Regions:
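Conserved small/polar residues in nucleotide/adenosyl-binding loops
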Residues: 136-142
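Nucleotide/phosphate-binding site architecture used for ATP/NTP-dependent chemistry
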Residues: 1-135
Length: 146
């Protein structure tokens, strides 16, 4: 198991229109509520590390030594019946990505990390309730939380 987390950020090889470098806003009084041990194992992340001060800095996006390239992603989509050519992560920072024990590359994203380049009125932080929905992941394989 790793007691630190080495991440790549393959998205930064894309043209700059697809992302903006973003640093998570400071989070006071960070603590662990629960840990998804199965996911931590898949990601090869030591649970003891996640509970440590270094792990808490990582989980809050504040470990600049290992996260020099955190970003927010841009995307397009329909909103209120109209195509909006530039939307983006208004309250999420992509810390990086890594190839897991099963050979699949997975993104590590901090949800509710504060305002980003793409933020609008209600964006920024996330309460424990909405984050819990991601944690339980409702059997959707595309989202799960450590």
């Amino acid at each position: 198991m790793m007691n630190s987390i080495n991440l790549e950020n393959t998205y930064t090889s894309l043209p700059p229109e697809f992302f903006r470098y973003t640093e998570a806003e400071a989070m006071p009084d960070v603590n662990v509520v629960t840990i998804n041990e199965q996911l931590a194992d898949l990601l090869n992340i030591d649970i003891g590390f996640l509970k440590s001060q270094s792990g808490l800095r990582f989980l809050s996006g504040k470990n600049s030594k290992t996260l020099p390239n955190s970003i927010s992603l841009a995307y397009a989509g329909h909103q209120f019946g109209h195509l909006v050519p530039q939307l983006g992560d208004g309250r999420a920072v992509l810390l990086g990505d890594k190839i897991c024990q099963d050979g699949v590359r997975r993104d590590i994203q901090l949800k509710g990390s504060g305002k980003t380049y793409f933020s609008r009125g209600g964006d920024g932080r996330a309460g424990i309730g909405p984050v819990t929905v991601s944690y339980t992941h409702l059997t959707l394989p595309t989202i799960c939380s450590v």
